[in-house]
Swiss-Prot record:
Domain of life: Bacteria
Active site: 163 (proton donor), 262 (proton acceptor)
Name of the molecule in the record: N-succinylamino acid racemase
Family: Belongs to the mandelate racemase/muconate lactonizing enzyme family. MenC type 2 subfamily.
UniProtKB keywords: Isomerase, Lyase, Magnesium, Metal-binding
Source organism: Thermus thermophilus (strain ATCC 27634 / DSM 579 / HB8)
Signal peptide residue numbers: none
Function: Acts as a N-succinylamino acid racemase (NSAR) that catalyzes the racemization of N-succinyl-L-phenylglycine. Also converts 2-succinyl-6-hydroxy-2,4-cyclohexadiene-1-carboxylate (SHCHC) to 2-succinylbenzoate (OSB). Catalyzes both N-succinylamino acid racemization and OSB synthesis at equivalent rates. However, NSAR activity is probably the protein's biological function, because menaquinone biosynthesis genes are missing in this species.
Needed cofactors: a divalent metal cation
Example GO molecular function: isomerase activity
InterPro entries: Enolase-like_C_sf (IPR036849), Enolase-like_N (IPR029017), Enolase_C-like (IPR029065), Mandelate_racemase_C (IPR013342), Mandelate_racemase_N_dom (IPR013341), OSBS/NAAAR (IPR010197)
The protein's Enzyme Commission number: 5.1.1.-, 4.2.1.113
Length: 369
């Protein structure tokens, strides 16, 4: 597979609602969109890094520089027979998994199309629909939270995840648990706590949470292992997992009993497959996380979530929850708590180019010649 050309864009999409977490508020999403061209085909990748390094260290500006000045010049015009060859081409460059993932996932789409197969089959998936839940940002009040939770349960979502932080945790989770005693309920702290908050976190054991996600520092494993020994509630690791090596160490330390997989955070599908294999061998359940993706990233996530190790409902909920209009033609919508995987070869979605043009802030076309 020879990569003949690439088009890189920065898009800005307004969210339909204010999304608050422990580290800030989002009302719009900046998206890095990559189109790869080769052998008459097009592969699509989407970057989910943010303008500021609030989730992980990587940013839109940094990823744009690496793709435009380093990664794409290194692969344009090269014959890359498979994604492993692309991985080897990028291996000299340390870190930056989110920037690498944009290129790698676009290449996976291109490669699957060249094979004439849907991506989920190429990855080893076993289903054509994925169980999904919703991730709810911090609401203005407990009463508002209860109303939003009730609406999403009525829509059929199979898991409710609430964002929490010190001062917005036990009481809101207790209210939801009492109102919906049979709901699958989880909490996501986005690194808002430390071991000094042990007493607060132990109180959450009363609430029958399916797990508490990333309670401690974004790059930590050791303290999560200490905390897990104190809690009956499983800890789910998110930000701390940046690749298969970190996953291996997390398993050895006992730092978490559940893993959140985000291919964009891990460096793409290849590294996600390696994490999947480690987790399966250790008996650790996986679920597909979300980063407020538009249609390209959402489609990639759905294809990966068809692998057998993904046994818990993920965050890949309906696109219409987030956007008045998406960047792809296909409607990616859940029904009765299930998201169908897009049909067709590759990731199975096509850009809605007139809309993409309207929301483009910057673009550059690069060719091998």
């Amino acid at each position: 597979m020879r990569i003949e050309a690439a088009e890189l864009r920065i898009l800005e999409l307004p969210l339909k609602f204010r999304f608050e977490t422990s580290f800030g508020v989002q009302t719009k999403r900046t998206i890095l969109l990559l189109r790869l061209f080769g052998e008459g085909l097009e592969g699509l990748g989407e970057g989910v890094m943010e303008r500021l390094p609030l989730y992980r260290e990587e940013t839109v500006a940094g990823a744009r520089y690496l793709l435009e000045e380093v990664f794409l010049p290194r692969v344009l015009g090269r014959d890359l027979p498979n994604p492993e060859a692309l991985r080897e081409a990028l291996a000299p460059f340390r870190g930056n998994p989110m920037a690498k993932a944009v290129l790698e996932m676009a290449f996976f789409d291109l490669w699957a199309k060249a094979l004439g197969r849907p991506l989920w089959q190429v990855l080893g998936g076993v289903r054509q629909a994925v169980e999904v839940g919703v991730s709810l940002g911090i609401q203005p009040s407990v009463e508002d939270t209860l109303r939003v939770v009730e609406r999403h349960l009525e829509e059929g979502y199979r898991r409710i995840k609430l964002k929490i932080k010190p001062g917005w945790d036990y009481e809101v989770l207790k209210a939801v648990r009492e109102a919906f005693p049979e709901a699958t309920l989880t909490a996501d702290a986005n690194s808002a706590y430390s071991l000094a908050n042990l007493a607060q976190l132990k109180r959450l054991d009363e609430l029958r949470l399916d797990y508490i996600e990333q309670p401690l520092a974004y790059d930590d494993l050791l303290d999560h292992a200490k905390l897990q020994r104190e809690l009956s509630t499983p800890i789910c690791l998110d930000e701390s997992l940046t690749g298969a090596e970190k996953a291996r160490k997390a398993i050895e330390l006992g730092a978490g009993r559940v893993f959140n997989v985000k291919p964009a955070r891990l460096g793409g599908h290849g590294e996600s497959l390696r994490v999947h294999a480690l987790a399966e061998s250790a008996g650790i359940p996986l679920w597909m996380g979300g980063m407020l993706e538009a249609g390209v990233g959402r489609a990639h996530n759905l294809h990966l979530a068809t692998l057998p190790g993904f046994t818990k409902p993920g965050d890949v909920s309906s696109a219409s929850r987030y956007w008045e209009e998406d960047i792809v033609e296909e409607a990616l919508e859940a029904k009765d708590g299930l998201m169908p995987v897009p049909e067709g070869v590759g990731i199975g979605v096509h850009l809605k180019l007139p809309f993409v043009e309207r929301v483009t802030l910057w673009q550059r076309y690069m060719s091998a010649s």
